[in-house]
Curated annotation (Swiss-Prot):
Keywords: ATP-binding, Cytoplasm, Fatty acid biosynthesis, Fatty acid metabolism, Lipid biosynthesis, Lipid metabolism, Nucleotide-binding, Transferase
GO molecular function: acetyl-CoA carboxylase activity; ATP binding; carboxyl- or carbamoyltransferase activity
Similarity remark: Belongs to the AccA family.
Pathway: Lipid metabolism; malonyl-CoA biosynthesis; malonyl-CoA from acetyl-CoA: step 1/1
Record bears the keyword Lipid metabolism: yes
Ranges for domain CoA carboxyltransferase C-terminal: 1-236
Organism expressing this protein natively: Streptococcus sanguinis (strain SK36)
Gene it is expressed from: accA
PANTHER family in UniProt: ACETYL-COENZYME A CARBOXYLASE CARBOXYL TRANSFERASE SUBUNIT ALPHA (PTHR42853), ACETYL-COENZYME A CARBOXYLASE CARBOXYL TRANSFERASE SUBUNIT ALPHA, CHLOROPLASTIC (PTHR42853:SF3)
HAMAP family: AcetylCoA_CT_alpha
Catalytic EC class: transferase
Protein name: Acetyl-coenzyme A carboxylase carboxyl transferase subunit alpha
Enzyme Commission designation: 2.1.3.15
Length: 256
């Protein structure tokens, strides 16, 4: 098994920690909130409020299931537009009350169904990008598994973007890339090598700001390590004047 094959397999592993695992394992007294107040609740997206060392934090994430029944409930981690609108509702609420935002991302991409398109999937993603770029509180985004296309980017316009070591982040899946470029989905691993989707490659290209090691950690230790990193970064970001925070975020993405 090649390195890229192993990373993709691990990124998609159903046994990986989910967004809800991180929310409940890192933030004390996490309370999940539901619904976008326009259409319905989307099971593919979780969000709520918890505390980190006594500081209130808004947490949102994209949730995959661990079995078929759970994946059907979670739509295999592919959010509908109401899911993105739920995250925006919670992030604007965080802005109102001065709470920092932490996002956990694990999705192959936004749901591409007809109903999702009719309800404004593209608009929902675009609005998240626009609103997050000017959200007046610190934002940390962490890719914990797959980071696929605009569906992932819709939660990743942040002051700091991190990846777990065995996660991936790309404009589309390697299978989709191979099908488009060569009309042959079986060449997915070859496509993955060209796409530069691994955490260390993206860190080198400055697409992400930090890689959190996984090797040698059990789940409890990984949660503790991520908690420590988040606490330290939020403390640092909270020291910045608002104008500087927003300018740094703008320049972070403008350089691409």
């Amino acid at each position: 098994m090649t390195k890229i094959t192993r990373i993709i397999k691990e990124a998609r592993d159903q046994a990986r920690l989910t967004a809800l695992d991180f929310a409940q394992g890192i933030f004390e007294n996490f309370v999940e909130l539901h619904g976008d107040r326009s259409f319905r609740d989307d099971g593919a997206v979780i969000g709520g409020i918890g505390t980190l060392n006594g500081q209130p934090v808004t947490v949102v994430g994209i949730q995959k299931g661990r079995n078929l029944q759970d994946n059907l409930r979670r739509n295999f981690g592919q959010p509908h537009p109401e899911g993105y609108r739920k995250t925006l509702r919670l992030m604007k609420q965080a802005e109102k009350f001065g709470r920092p935002v932490v996002t956990f991302i694990n999705t192959a991409g936004a749901y591409p169904g007809v109903g999702a398109e009719e309800r404004g999937q593209g608009e929902a993603i675009a609005r998240n990008l626009m609103e997050m770029s000017n959200l007046k509180v610190p934002i940390i985004a962490i890719i914990i598994g797959e980071g696929g296309s605009g569906g992932a980017l819709a939660l990743a316009v942040a002051d700091k973007v991190w990846m777990l070591e065995n996660s991936m982040y790309a404009v589309l899946s390697p299978e989709g890339f191979a099908s488009i470029l060569w009309k042959d989905g079986s060449r997915a691993m070859e496509a993955a090598e060209l796409m530069k989707i691994t955490s260390h490659e993206l860190l080198q290209m400055e697409v992400v700001d930090k890689v959190i090691p996984e090797r040698g950690f059990n789940n409890h230790e990984l949660l503790a390590a991520v908690k420590e990193e988040i606490a330290a970064e939020l403390d640092s970001l909270s020291q910045l004047p608002l104008e500087q925070l927003l300018e740094n975020r703008y320049q972070r993405f403008r350089k691409y």
